[in-house]
Swiss-Prot record:
Catalytic reactions on record: guanosine(37) in tRNA + S-adenosyl-L-methionine = N(1)-methylguanosine(37) in tRNA + S-adenosyl-L-homocysteine + H(+)
Subunit structure: Homodimer.
One term of GO molecular function: tRNA (guanine(37)-N1)-methyltransferase activity
Binding residues for S-adenosyl-L-methionine: G107, L127, G128, D129, F130, I131, L132
Function: Specifically methylates guanosine-37 in various tRNAs.
Record family assignment: Belongs to the RNA methyltransferase TrmD family.
GO annotations of cellular component type: cytosol
Protein name according to UniProt: tRNA (guanine-N(1)-)-methyltransferase
Enzyme class, broadest EC rank: transferase
Domain of life: Bacteria
Record carries keyword Transferase: yes
Signal peptide: none
One protein family per Pfam: tRNA_m1G_MT
Length: 227
């Protein structure tokens, strides 16, 4: 899989591309990340990429020329990061993980000239109902969520019971020691009875989801009732 990142701040991604599963995936040639500074495409002699908004208003807007010229040099599904976009979730991550190539456009300042969105972007994505200074942090989160779903990146068994796979949150997990300052691990987990452990974990997933995320609980019930 190839991921193109269009940004004004390529150094944001230097450590990101070296560390943890992203670094390993790149090292083992499971993915390719191509970071493009779209300032390099500006035809302005000072490499300016922003200007005032027609009709007035605060702040500066990213201009169409450098962004479009950069977009036309890369391939794949083209995604703009924007507060107006579809909310990113695990379902979207799964769909994007099936693509051979995607391009993520990181915004800055007051956003993009609307002609970019209307004519050169396939769709917009948002991490949630809050504002970031730029799209770089959102891009990292989205890329991380996508890459870990690719084959041979993470043990498939580890992915099966992860949060959101079936609209249930994950079960509580514990490690040694079994007793820390009187705080004990549930007895069932050290019983060695794998059937009872499996039942306990499923019960905990349902209880936690119902309590913490009633929206996911409703989705889980709909699927469960259809079976």
């Amino acid at each position: 899989m190839k991921i193109n990142i269009l940004t004004l701040f390529p150094r944001y991604f230097e450590v990101f591309c070296r560390e943890s599963i992203i670094g390993k995936a790149i090292k083992h040639k499971k993915i390719t990340i191509n970071v493009v500074n779209f300032r390099d495409f500006s035809k302005n002699k000072h490499k300016k990429v922003d200007d005032y908004v027609y009709g007035g208003g605060p702040g500066l807007l990213l201009q169409i020329q450098p962004v479009v010229d950069a977009l036309e040099k890369v391939g794949g599904l083209k995604i703009a990061l924007s507060p107006q976009g579809q909310k990113f979730d695990q379902g979207v991550a799964r769909k994007l993980a099936k693509e051979d190539e995607i391009t993520i456009l990181c915004g800055h300042y007051e956003g993009f000239d609307q002609r970019i969105i209307d004519n050169f972007i396939d769709f917009e994505l948002s991490l949630g109902d809050f504002i970031l200074t730029g799209g770089e942090i959102a891009a990292m989160a989205i890329i991380d969520a996508i890459i870990r779903l690719k084959p041979d990146i993470i043990n498939p068994e580890s992915l099966k019971n992860e949060t959101f796979n079936d609209f249930l949150l994950d079960f509580p997990q514990y490690s040694r020691p079994a007793n820390f300052r009187g705080l004990e691990v549930p007895n069932v987990l050290i019983s060695g009875n794998h059937r009872e452990i499996g039942e306990w974990r499923q019960e905990q997933r349902e209880l936690i989801t119902k309590k913490k995320r009633p929206d996911l609980w409703e989705k889980f019930l709909k699927i469960k009732n259809k079976k």
